[in-house]
UniProtKB/Swiss-Prot annotation:
Modified residues (Phosphoserine): S17, S63, S64
Any GO MF annotation of the entry: purine ribonucleoside triphosphate binding
Residue list for modification Phosphotyrosine: Y159
Family according to the record: Belongs to the peptidase T1A family.
Compartment(s): Cytoplasm; Nucleus
Name this polypeptide is given: Proteasome subunit alpha type-6
Organism of derivation: Homo sapiens (Human)
Modified residues (N6-acetyllysine): K102, K104
Oligomer and partners: The 26S proteasome consists of a 20S proteasome core and two 19S regulatory subunits. The 20S proteasome core is a barrel-shaped complex made of 28 subunits that are arranged in four stacked rings. The two outer rings are each formed by seven alpha subunits, and the two inner rings are formed by seven beta subunits. The proteolytic activity is exerted by three beta-subunits PSMB5, PSMB6 and PSMB7. Interacts with ALKBH4.
Upper classification of the organism: Eukaryota, Metazoa, Chordata, Craniata, Vertebrata
Amino acid sequence: MSRGSSAGFDRHITIFSPEGRLYQVEYAFKAINQGGLTSVAVRGKDCAVIVTQKKVPDKLLDSSTVTHLFKITENIGCVMTGMTADSRSQVQRARYEAANWKYKYGYEIPVDMLCKRIADISQVYTQNAEMRPLGCCMILIGIDEEQGPQVYKCDPAGYYCGFKATAAGVKQTESTSFLEKKVKKKFDWTFEQTVETAITCLSTVLSIDFKPSEIEVGVVTVENPKFRILTEAEIDAHLVALAERD
């Protein structure tokens, strides 16, 4: 076996390859793209927005039960990209951690602490042989009492960070470069601008004009810090506004 080849090293999650890589963790990042979806999160002046594609794989499915947006606490929501079952498991764990925090300390968990906690748990999955990393990426949004709107993302390796805008999924690279250009020009977006930037980003990189039933939008604003998912009618209003501007 040549030293450069990866044979034998991707069997075990806890073994470094000679190049110093953990192959199983790298494969987990590839698994995020298995779902074939892309998600985008953008932070505005007084709001944070998450947008993701909504694909109903089967004509017989009830489309109202297909979602990638989850409410973790009253004020924190997330978008999950990647393997659906892993995503649900991570959301369940996040809800447990948030409830536990509230019980212990008597106040709601801040977004960054929740993201840190989930990232810490993911990191343990990369260390133990009997566990497998989750093939999903979580982007959290919420309004912090001191910092204002927050967007946090954590990945299967246990890395987490706050963002002005970020993306996950198949077209992550394209979305990121689109958002970088947008953020460079201007950053203090109003609520409408934030939602529309996120939708434009998604429709540009995927080069499709969305119908309201094909995307999901989750928002938190400073005026109304409760996480809520926009209805199709509200999404339609934003899409119409975008179409008129073009």
